[in-house]
Amino acid sequence: MKRIMLFLVTNLAVMLVLGVVLNILFSVLGINKSSISGLLMFCAVFGFGGSFISLLMSKWMAKRSYGVQVIEQPRNETEHWLVSTVARQAREAGIKMPEVGIYDSPEMNAFATGARRDDSLVAVSSGLLYSMSRDEAEAVLAHEVSHVANGDMVTLTLIQGVVNTFVMFFARIVAGVISNFFSSNNDEESSSSGGFAYMITVFVLEMAFGVLASMIVMWFSRQREFRADAGAAKLAGRDKMIAALQRLSRGAEPQMEGSMMAFGINGKRSMSELFMSHPPIEQRIAALRG
């Protein structure tokens, strides 16, 4: 689950920065905010830009954020097994060998990240390696390799880009309507204060619409989890995948944050399933059992 939350947080930060830049460009270039086509074009450029910048930074940020130690040369039997298992699964899935790494954490989790299928990273926590059986860990690795093979990060990026575009677009449309409604005159002072109020309103609306839009992203994320589970069942075996999920259900709630969350094996619980990046484990097991 680590991967998606880090992605979303990075994307949000980039969106906020680009949103400020967008407002400045409107003023400098004299673009009419009421021009729907021009506004939509700019929002699309910056909306998709934020997503793709997050995507390109995803592997670098994952390594830095979680202290992932990439295995260059296996130093022990566990690392040998880890690298050889991922290599075998990558061949079977038809992708290039991902980088393989370990990060220090007591929780049982793993994630995959990377901008392309053939330039990816699969990382596992030390807690997973020492708490799971080899069969269970093999299924977890297969789940992450399936995320890479399915191109899930690129898919999420495209979805997030569309969501970003419409969040930015409708925030500015609604802010413009509100600003016009409360404008009583066009004197210089009113114009100056009105511009500031418009920017604040846009910021607040982007936050509000962003929360609502995240439900769309999370829904797609949950569908990709079911697909990754099915892929893992093919690569490692259905019984191993079910056993791994059952083992995860008995463990502590993961503490992953950021974009890593969606592409980890396990996700955080939420008051509402609408905001969960992963389906409940019992649903995932039921789907595997058919």
Curated annotation (Swiss-Prot):
Its cofactor is Zn(2+). It comes from Aeromonas salmonicida (strain A449). Coiled coil: none annotated. Its main location: membrane. Zn(2+) binds at residues 143, 147, 225. InterPro entries: HtpX_protease (IPR050083), Pept_M48_protease_HtpX (IPR022919), Peptidase_M48 (IPR001915). GO terms for biological process: proteolysis. It is found in: Cell inner membrane. The chain crosses the membrane at residues 6-26, 36-56, 158-178, 200-220. Keywords: Cell inner membrane, Cell membrane, Hydrolase, Membrane, Metal-binding, Metalloprotease, Protease, Transmembrane, Transmembrane helix, Zinc. This is Protease HtpX. Its EC number is 3.4.24.-.
